[in-house]
Amino acid sequence: MTARQFCLGWHWYPYGYARTVVDGDGAPVKAMPPWLAALGAAAAEAAGHAVEDTYDIALVNFYDADARMGMHRDSDEKSSAPVVSLSLGDTCVFRFGNTRTRTKPYTDVELRSGDLLVFGGPSRLAYHGVPRVLPGTAPPELGLTGRLNVTLRVSGLTEEGGPPAPADGPPSRAPLKP
């Protein structure tokens, strides 16, 4: 992954979530804005998915002209609620694959500024990635060079049963339990 990322609600790090930036400076994660959680729920509903829990994670990725994201699955959440993805800025090639492997078959789709993609149900765990960004394709009125992607998820996590807050030293890297 060469995109730069920050998180709201829960901090994602490979294979887990935490309330602090465990693989960075240890700072607390900023709260998920209620309006952004509501956007996730409205998008999922408009796509025909009933979501009972609140969207409580936003992964905000910035892609410059050379950034990429390899094929991966959004599988660290305990919830099966759909993933909601909002694109702003430069167009990207979004590769949407299958649920078994990172390789073919997959479909390449251009995501443009303002596009909103919802994937849930059987496709919730499909491998997907961004093999390239198309520089200079952002709407000029946006004033943005590069691409911002806001990915909204429902964690299915609770504070209870998670690791205790450390007294000293680096925070625990263990993911919280459902």
What are these regions (language model features)?
Residues 1-178:
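Non-heme Fe(II) oxygenase metal-center motifs and adjacent flexible, charged/small-residue loops
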